[in-house]
Amino acid sequence: MSEASDLDPKAVRLQFARRTQRLAGADFLLREIERRMLERLELVRVQPALIVDAGCGLGQGSVLLQQRYPAANVLGIDVSAPMAAAAAALHGMQARRSMFDRLRQLFGAAQPGAQAPLFVAADAASLPLPAASVDLVWSNLAWHWFTDPGALLQEWRRAARGGCLLMFSAFGVDSLRELRDIGVSTPRFDDMHDIGDWLVTAGFAEPVMDAERMTVTWESPQRLLSELHALGGNAVRSRGKGMRGRHFLQSRLDRLAGLAGPDGRIALSVEIVYGHAWAPAQRPLPPGFSPVHFDRGGGRGKP
């Protein structure tokens, strides 16, 4: 069972709504991990008809998945309506079409292969999709924005068709530890072994988890703080409310400056967790066999 999160879902939506225009200039790590995930995907044989990009942001990953699988329908889902609209506009979609119009196109009479992804503002933990309809669930570095990982995986399992591949990346527990050491709060990052257990509990099979560590550097405290804010900021319930003064900001910049190395750059540790698992396919019965259904009622049937 996953632990309760300190994330405020309303704050998550507001943070990303405010940062829609700033994300594109600060998403270098998202794009790099996306590239590495796509390399891993090359090793897997799948021919998905419906792909869900959970936590799609500005939709770059959705577009690359559409290019990889041109016959598939790709649905980019983000909890922020302004973010989903910006993704649609960025990639030439009509940003103002309603979610129901989009889903009607997806499950209606349209021919397979949508040419471009559909972008929908929705909760990835409550997908606007029927059960057993998705062939590939993809999520790139959005895990720490989901408030209940166990419930999230159960929802993805509900939507997954038999044989569906789940592929995702997440920040590991050692990410940004230098910030925590100087008293700067960070989101809660889950241990990959816990994630593996949650996958099994949710009903996924053959989970594979691994991690890699890297160091990311910034040229100044101001640049580091700006990019971290652009990537989502602080959305925990325990965050301070109201406006922070100039002295608070300067104190934070001074603490960050203390992390600088001899070259003046600030280095932070990042642990990237990769995971994939499968929704078990329903096994066909051997020839000549048929299912037997038992009536558990108390009455006796007629002979």
What are these regions (language model features)?
Residues 50-127:
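Class I SAM-dependent methyltransferase SAM/SAH-binding core
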Residues 125-136:
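A short acidic, Gly/Pro-enriched loop at the edge of an enzyme's catalytic core
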Residues 212-303:
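Conserved Class I S-adenosyl-L-methionine
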Residues 150-162:
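A short glycine-rich, Lys/Arg-flanked "PGG" loop and its adjoining helix->strand segment in the class I
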Residues 161-223, 230-245:
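Conserved catalytic/acceptor-binding region of the Class I
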